[in-house]
Amino acid sequence: VLTRRLERALICADNARVVNVSSKVHSIVKKLDFASLRKPTKSLSGINEYAVSKLANILFTSELHRRYASLGISSFAIHPGLVDTEIWRTLPFFLRPILKLKGMLTPEEGAKNVLQCAFVDASTYSGKYFSKCTPSSPSTLATDQELAIKLWEQSESWMNHYSE
């Protein structure tokens, strides 16, 4: 929504960039069910919903690139790494040490990974997915161009519906 609201400013700017924060967890999504996106969740952990949102960020990045690269807008999706933030606050206490062993990043280190996309070569990497500062391959579902178009169009429809 924010990117679409800033569309005119992005088009007018020199070398505009949109960086969407994603996550490797997007890869657990096997199918994107648009009907379920409008229903209240029954999930207790929220992990599936989080994964879907991160998949959507990658698909949006790809479609933004396809639609706007010729107008000078670059787009990137990045998994910053496993960052030690409040997102883990609902994780059972006994599991937290396991995450620490996996090498959690400080928020500053995670932000550094995100900021890197502000400086990479846009002509080479726009529309791409990064994992911890490195261009990476997202899941097969995240590279489905038809799904990216469908998500874009559905999102436009929902935004129009709710902004009336």
Kindly label every feature range from the protein language model:
Residues Y68-G72, T124, N160-E164:
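Surface-exposed helix-capping loop/turn segments at secondary-structure junctions
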Residues I11-L99:
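Catalytic loop of short-chain dehydrogenase/reductase
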Residues S27-K31, L141, E146-E164:
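Non-catalytic terminal and boundary segments that flank Rossmann-like NAD(P)-dependent oxidoreductase
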Residues V1-L6, L10, F60-T61, C117:
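Hydrophobic positions on the long internal alpha-helix
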Residues S53, A77, L99-P138, T143-L147:
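C-terminal helical subdomain
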